[in-house]
Amino acid sequence: MQDALDAQSENPKKIFMDVYTDWCGPCKLLDKKTFRNPDVVKYVNEHFYAVKFDAEGNDEFTYQGNKFSNPDYVAGKRGRKPSHIFARSLRISGYPSMVFFDEKSNLIFPVTGFHTPQQLEIFLKLIQSDDYKQVTSQKMFKAYEKNFVGTFKG
């Protein structure tokens, strides 16, 4: 995360953060089926700083003036581990979660659960185009979704 935050200061781009855990089956499926899709890879690399964030890992970084770490991290522990303070601060409780941040590192919103490339496409393009600023209700999102024409291949 720190690398993406540092890069934003020189070249502002939004951040796309994949929040996962070691034991999460849908997280592994997302890696295998969605994040290896050529359309997803190309689009994310062109428009976002991509971050993989272990929600139970021991990364340390500074976000918006606050230092984040996982003081309860135990190296080598298998299965569920204590959550990273950053994951808790974002109120991430389900995995996988994909979290979007704007060019100034402000949280936009998270998307939870496994998504196919075609299901993820609408969120990537909604965020990248800044349309999310106008789509402010579930009803508006349904209308946006109905009119959305995707281009990602399976």
Predicted regions and their residues:
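A short beta-strand-turn-helix
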Residues: 1-15, 44
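Serine-hydrolase catalytic core recognition
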Residues: 35
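Thioredoxin-like thiol-disulfide oxidoreductase module
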Residues: 2-3, 38-41, 45-109, 117, ...
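Thiol-/selenol-based redox modules, centered on thioredoxin-like
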Residues: 110-154
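A short, structure-level motif marking secondary-structure boundaries and short turns
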Residues: 25-26, 69
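Detector for the c-type heme attachment site
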Residues: 28-32
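Short active-site neighborhood of thiol/selenol oxidoreductases, capturing the structured segment around
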Residues: 10-25, 50
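Glycine-rich, histidine-containing beta strand-loop boundary motifs that form or position
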Residues: 19, 102, 112
